[in-house]
Amino acid sequence: TAKCADEGHVAVFGDRLKTVPVRKRASVFDTLKTVNDIGKDIGMGTEHGIWLFWKAAIEQKQHWDTVFVYSDQQAGHGGLFGSGGYSVAGRGCSWPGRRAAYIDVPMLINLYRKKVNPKVHVVMVQTAGYQDTLVPEQYDRTYILGGWSDQIIKYAATMIALRDGPQQ
C-alpha cells in the first residue's frame, strides 16, 4: 500500500510503535527485511500500536491524507484493555463508564480529524476474517474492507474518488 503513494510509511507495532518510510525505488524485499527486523524487538503487545499511532499523529500534528490499518480489528472497540489514564492532547480517550480503561479508537480518529486533518480517509482492512471492526461503518471518509489483495488499493482509491472527486 505504501509504495502506491507519493510518500508512504509502514508502522510496526507491539509494546512500542516504529514507523518506517517506504521508498518507491527501494526493493520490497529490503523494506520487508527492515520491518521484520524491527518486529523481532518491538514487543508482544497486539493492540497498543493503533493507539500510539493516533496519539503521535495528533500530538505531533502529522498530516496524513489516507491511513490504511491492516489489522484483525480487535483493538479499541470497547472490549479490549488499554493502559489506564490514556490521554491524547489533554483529553481522555477511554470508553466512559468502565472500571478498566478501554481505548476508544473512533474517538482518537475524530480527535485527529478535529485537531489535524478533517479530510483524512481511514481504510480499515480486516485481515483475520472476524466480523468486527475498529470503527462504525457509517463514519464519513472511513472504509471497511477485508482480505489480502492488490485490489484493496484500487477499491479504496475508487471509494475516495467517489467521495472527494478525482485526485489532481
Describe each PLM feature range:
Residues 1-168:
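Acidic, glycine-rich A-domain
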